[in-house]
């Protein structure tokens, strides 16, 4: 087969596939151009999740006719001049590929007017062909329009997800960009409806509240770390405000949203290791300002990956600051300032080898002192009261079945405010009260749903709550399922909702937290079928049952156990954990050597 030289049109389409994989990439590149043009106000409009229209308007510097004509040429950029500049990148974009790639697969237009000039120019191009430039009389700044994205690459269209999914990806990206650039105003529209609007502010906390919600912003603590080569401004949830998923974890490097390097992600989780449950996650936003020569962003065209020259140094600083803040009770804001670097010492470290840390190690401050605990000789204790040789007695548990029980099960009491002790037919049973209550509620709820007899409790005072724009979109897409299951939710303003009714069987509980937890569960599996989502909602709602630590009366315990054995699957909770543990009289007597 002979070797052929590809046409420029084919080359452009192939290159476009690397830079513009989906509408999200086009939106991201255009918004970054606006930021690099020092815009203080950016408006983004999309239709059909960006496939029909993407329009980005800004009040930045604009372009003259010469720069406008160069802007759509591949590898034409105002950000760098040569390879050396890659080591000192201050802008978000620098490759000179974005506009050429977008123009190759869309009907593309730029309208721009440079600051200080009386008039502007408009450039239009269809699939990198028929380039036209004409005068334009608009305001200072730039408006970029992308219509019929991928009209000439049907294979690319075929691999796009649903409008809901593609729109969600765009909104997620714009949320990150708005969080990173809190000093710029953003207005985001989808199908001519406002998705979110964030006014220009000098407060990161205000922007976090605008995007991620006031309730979340109130839970955040703050530490500031000033170092000669890097500054960190960290907003993080405390020990009592852990989250069900990793949704609220952001890293911004020089105002660029990036993925967490594995090393820094490990640092965050290690900092929280002893502060939150293993199945929970922290919310954390890290804003870093670092010398551009200390990072490498030229790793992937998406510019989501970044390498730090001294990850170990940053790890050390961040870990100690976060760990100390979590251990400390009070003082929501902590500031750590480092002395200027000793240049001679720093140079000596560089000469001695690359393993020398670039960041000076810091002394961990003493939060409080404890008296040393007395040391016990556990070995001698083990010799005198070891139960290892009896461990196998309790390991052999008989299979639990409803047939093992009769109606005369006797509740003995509750221990540790978590377990209910009962006896039946000469055997002893330990019930996990939370797992048992979850199973009872789950099957009652499921039964009422299938028979369409869900009893509704109207709320005297509706519960209002806010969500981030992307989570709002997810709730709107699934709101009918909630309503079918008796959880009545209404839109109540931009990214605000209210709950007006809920299933009576759930009892007197806060529905706001339950709904937020359910949405987090759905987000983890966005592509689940409707039946799976219904089941997920019911399972999540039932988590609000009797908890471990709740004091249960004798009558409540008796009713719970009786209800449990009316269930089809009484011996596991809806999430698969066991509800009961059986110890036979025979096992007990063997342990005490009565047999």
Curated annotation (Swiss-Prot):
Origin organism is Endomicrobium trichonymphae
* GO terms, biological process: mismatch repair
What's a Gene Ontology MF term here? mismatched DNA binding
Record protein name field = DNA mismatch repair protein MutL
Q: What does this protein do?
A: This protein is involved in the repair of mismatches in DNA. It is required for dam-dependent methyl-directed DNA mismatch repair. May act as a 'molecular matchmaker', a protein that promotes the formation of a stable complex between two or more DNA-binding proteins in an ATP-dependent manner without itself being part of a final effector complex.
Tell me where on the tree of life, at the top rank, the source sits: Bacteria
Q: Which UniProt keywords apply?
A: DNA damage, DNA repair
Task: Tell me which SMART domains the record gives.
Answer: DNA_mis_repair, MutL_C
Similarity comment: family membership? Belongs to the DNA mismatch repair MutL/HexB family.
User: What are its GO cellular component terms?
Assistant: mismatch repair complex
In Pfam terms, one family for this protein is DNA_mis_repair
- Reply yes or no: does the keyword Ion transport apply: no
PANTHER family under this entry? DNA MISMATCH REPAIR PROTEIN MLH, PMS, MUTL (PTHR10073), DNA MISMATCH REPAIR PROTEIN MLH1 (PTHR10073:SF12)
């Amino acid at each position: 087969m002979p070797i052929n030289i590809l046409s420029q049109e084919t080359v452009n389409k192939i290159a476009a596939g690397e830079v513009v994989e989906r509408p999200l990439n086009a939106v991201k590149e255009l918004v970054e151009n606006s930021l690099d043009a020092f815009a203080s106000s950016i408006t983004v409009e999309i239709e059909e999740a960006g496939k029909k229209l993407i329009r980005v308007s800004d009040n930045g510097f604009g372009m003259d006719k010469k720069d406008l004509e160069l802007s759509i040429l591949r590898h034409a950029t105002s950000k760098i001049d040569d390879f050396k500049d890659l080591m000192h990148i201050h802008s978000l974009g620098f490759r000179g590929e974005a506009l050429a790639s977008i123009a190759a697969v869309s009907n593309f237009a730029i309208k721009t007017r440079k600051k200080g000039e009386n008039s502007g120019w408009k450039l239009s191009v269809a699939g990198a062909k028929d380039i036209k430039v004409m005068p334009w009389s608009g305001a200072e700044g730039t408006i970029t329009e992308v219509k019929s994205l991928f009209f000439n690459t049907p294979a690319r269209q075929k691999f796009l997800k649903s409008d809901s999914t593609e729109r969600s990806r765009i909104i997620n990206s714009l949320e990150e960009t708005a969080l990173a650039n809190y000093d710029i105003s953003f207005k985001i529209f989808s199908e001519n409806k406002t998705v979110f609007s964030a006014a220009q502010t000098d407060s990161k906390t205000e922007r976090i509240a605008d995007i991620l919600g006031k309730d979340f912003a109130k839970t955040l603590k703050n530490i500031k770390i000033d170092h000669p080569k890097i500054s960190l401004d960290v907003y993080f949830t405390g020990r009592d405000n852990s989250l069900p998923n990793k949704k609220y974890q952001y890293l911004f490097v020089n105002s660029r949203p990036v993925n967490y390097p594995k090393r820094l992600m490990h640092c965050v989780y290690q900092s929280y290791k002893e502060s939150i449950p293993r199945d929970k996650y922290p919310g954390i936003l890290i804003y870093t300002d670092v010398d551009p020569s200390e990072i490498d962003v030229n790793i992937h065209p998406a510019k989501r990956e970044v390498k730090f020259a001294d990850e170990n140094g940053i790890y050390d600083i961040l870990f100690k600051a976060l760990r100390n803040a979590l251990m400390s009770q009070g003082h929501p804001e902590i500031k750590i300032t480092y002395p200027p670097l000793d240049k001679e010492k720093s140079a000596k470290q560089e000469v001695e080898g690359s393993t020398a840390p670039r960041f000076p190690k810091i002394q961990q401050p003493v939060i409080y002192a404890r008296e040393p605990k007395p040391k016990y000789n556990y070995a001698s204790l083990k010799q005198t009261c070891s139960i290892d040789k009896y461990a196998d007695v309790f390991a052999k548990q008989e299979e639990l079945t409803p047939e093992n029980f009769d109606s005369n099960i006797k509740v003995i009491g509750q221990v540790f405010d978590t377990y209910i002790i009962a006896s039946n037919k000469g055997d002893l049973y330990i019930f996990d009260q939370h797992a048992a209550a979850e199973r009872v509620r789950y099957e009652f709820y499921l039964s009422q749903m299938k028979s369409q007899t869900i009893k509704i409790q109207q709320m005297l005072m509706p519960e209002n709550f806010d969500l981030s724009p992307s989570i709002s979109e997810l709730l709107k897409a699934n709101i009918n399922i909630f309503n079918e299951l008796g959880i009545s939710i209404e839109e109540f303003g931009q990214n605000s909702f209210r709950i007006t009714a809920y299933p009576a069987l759930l009892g007197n509980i806060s529905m706001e937290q339950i709904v937020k937890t359910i949405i987090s569960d759905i987000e983890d599996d966005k592509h689940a079928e409707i039946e799976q989502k219904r089941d997920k909602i019911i399972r999540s709602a039932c988590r609000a049952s009797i908890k471990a630590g709740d004091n249960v009366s004798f009558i409540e315990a008796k009713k719970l156990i009786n209800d449990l054995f009316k269930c089809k699957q009484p011996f596991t909770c809806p999430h698969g954990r066991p509800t009961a543990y059986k110890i036979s009289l025979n096992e007990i007597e063997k342990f005490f050597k009565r047999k």
